[in-house]
């Protein structure tokens, strides 16, 4: 995300300031002209016109919120949060920062790190209309598409959880189909041929290939979304389902399968490792080389 945004800003003569808890990650952007802000979110909130954040969980977002409001923030600062968090957390953070004069929107992103690098992310954008109009060019610089989810920021994170439910369900579906094929004498290539012919979309093709090839380890050259992150996101879906009295049976199954992988020490594998749990339940080996 940040590399594409830096490229866009550089062309328009503007600068990008970056911060990461792991400063070495932020430093990678220095080589393309970004400025590393070593003094953290408070300094960014004081100096910047627009602030983008991508944080792991609700606790991290709330901590950054405390720092932004304590800065104090620059007048009319716009903050666009791209994290996958619980909608009530988005609503809470929005109310708090807005009381300090900050204009807040949510634009959580669909896509793994490799999609971000290739500018293939999809954003679920929610916030006041004039704000969205003003920062849309920045988001377009980081995405291939934007889904407008209205004026309430928490609807952006609700959209993200609904979308991630689709993705998690696809992973479970592929895992079960591949396991059925394995046990019934079909080749995995037969499964991939069906996917590529009948269901040619990036999510199903991508995870279909990854699962069929047992390509579950994550590395810098083979990015993915880890089991630990999957548990967090599916946990948020289930929490929202409980709060709204909605049955998400597939989410419950995926959560159980991810928990099994975490218990086996596979927390850093891609969440496509759901297939290992399905295989084990079906009497096949449930291990793969990391």
Predicted regions and their residues:
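Rossmann-fold dinucleotide-binding core
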Residues: 84-168
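NAD(P)+-binding Rossmann beta1-loop-alpha1 motif at the extreme N-terminus of oxidoreductases
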Residues: 1-53, 73-78, 83, 92, ...
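Helical "substrate-binding/catalytic lid" subdomain
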Residues: 155-281
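Glycine/threonine-rich flexible loop motifs
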Residues: 55-67
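Buried hydrophobic positions in well-ordered alpha/beta secondary-structure cores of metabolic enzymes
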Residues: 1, 29, 48-51, 61, ...
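Glycine-centered short loops/turns at secondary-structure junctions
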Residues: 12-13, 33, 101, 185, ...
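Hydrophobic beta-strand scaffold residues
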Residues: 16, 36-37, 103-105, 146, ...
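Helix N-cap at the beta1-alpha1 junction of Rossmann-like dinucleotide-binding domains, i.e.
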Residues: 23-24, 58, 129
């Amino acid at each position: 995300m940040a590399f594409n945004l830096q490229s866009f800003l550089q062309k328009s003569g503007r600068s990008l300031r970056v911060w990461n808890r792991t400063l070495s990650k932020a430093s990678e952007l220095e080589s393309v002209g970004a400025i590393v802000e070593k003094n953290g979110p408070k300094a960014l909130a004081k100096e910047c016109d627009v602030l983008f954040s991508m944080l792991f969980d609700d606790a991290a977002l709330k901590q950054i919120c405390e720092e932004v409001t304590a800065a104090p923030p620059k007048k009319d600062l716009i903050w666009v949060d791209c994290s996958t968090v619980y909608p009530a957390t988005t609503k809470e953070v929005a109310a708090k920062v807005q009381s300090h004069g900050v204009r807040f929107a949510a634009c959580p992103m669909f896509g793994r790190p490799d999609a971000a690098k290739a500018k293939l992310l999809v954003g679920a954008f929610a916030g006041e209309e004039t704000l969205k109009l003003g920062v849309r060019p920045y988001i377009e610089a980081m995405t291939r598409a934007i889904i407008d989810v209205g004026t309430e920021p928490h609807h952006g994170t609700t959209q993200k959880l609904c979308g991630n439910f689709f993705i998690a369900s696809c992973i479970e579906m592929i895992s079960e189909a591949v396991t059925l094929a394995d046990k019934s004498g079909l080749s995995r290539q037969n499964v991939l041929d069906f996917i590529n012919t009948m269901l040619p979309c990036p999510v199903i093709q991508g995870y279909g290939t990854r699962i069929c090839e047992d390509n579950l380890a994550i590395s810098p050259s083979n990015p993915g979304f880890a089991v630990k992150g999957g548990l967090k996101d599916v946990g948020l879906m289930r929490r929202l389902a409980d709060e709204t009295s909605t049955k998400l049976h597939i989410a419950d199954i995926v959560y159980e399968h991810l928990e099994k992988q975490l218990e086996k020490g596979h927390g850093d594998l891609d969440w496509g490792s759901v297939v290992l749990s399905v295989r084990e339940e079906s009497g096949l080996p449930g291990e793969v080389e990391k």
